[in-house]
């Protein structure tokens, strides 16, 4: 069971930060922090693909094969692709490739790439039903090594701006779920320091 740490009311619903295991949190749409091959080979991506069962790996392999026939990556940095959820507690999954800060070229442009990743997620969500509850781990964290303080601030800024925007995203509850103490502490600190700005 995930513990609720932060709750923020927005124009179109609510944003909550939870401490726990994302694979146990139910929602309409769940986000997987993917790599560009959609292979689920490391970190949270691997754990979530394992929890979804072999059907998801086969489905992602099919997407990869199809994209490679056109000489394209299955899902590039700053892109998103949706799939069925298989054994995860959601109706659909959105695989989003965030910046990998272990790579110098991506680290240099990490802020822009992270923003692009969230924008790709929001665009992909627009075509999914149901989507009232969105479950997501913070993008770019985990093995992709995005700096936690900066990542916490950007995650809050981007998601709250989206949920407070004039256009209704069709999402009523955003559940940001992390199991990393350091990221959670940074989220709490950033929220306390900037609550009036958010």
Model-flagged regions — what are they?
Residues 1-198:
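Macrodomain-like recognition of ADP-ribose-binding/processing modules
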């Amino acid at each position: 069971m995930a513990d609720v740490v932060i709750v923020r009311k927005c124009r179109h619903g609510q944003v909550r930060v939870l401490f726990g295991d994302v694979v146990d949190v139910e929602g309409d749409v769940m986000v997987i922090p993917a790599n560009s091959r959609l292979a689920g080979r490391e970190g949270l991506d691997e754990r979530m693909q394992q929890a979804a069962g072999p059907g998801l790996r086969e489905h992602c392999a099919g997407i990869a094969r199809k994209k490679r026939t056109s000489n394209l990556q299955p899902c590039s940095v700053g892109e998103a692709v949706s799939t069925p959820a298989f054994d995860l507690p959601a109706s659909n999954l959105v695989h989003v490739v965030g910046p990998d800060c272990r790579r110098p070229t991506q680290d240099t442009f990490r802020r822009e790439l992270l923003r692009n990743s969230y924008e790709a997620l929001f665009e992909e969500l627009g075509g999914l039903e149901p989507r009232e509850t969105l479950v997501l781990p913070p993008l770019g964290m985990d093995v992709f090594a995005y700096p936690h303080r900066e990542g916490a601030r950007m995650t809050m800024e981007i998601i709250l701006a989206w949920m407070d925007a004039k256009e209704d995203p069709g999402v009523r509850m955003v559940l940001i779920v992390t199991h990393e103490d350091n990221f959670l502490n940074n989220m709490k600190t950033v929220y306390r320091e900037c609550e009036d700005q958010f």
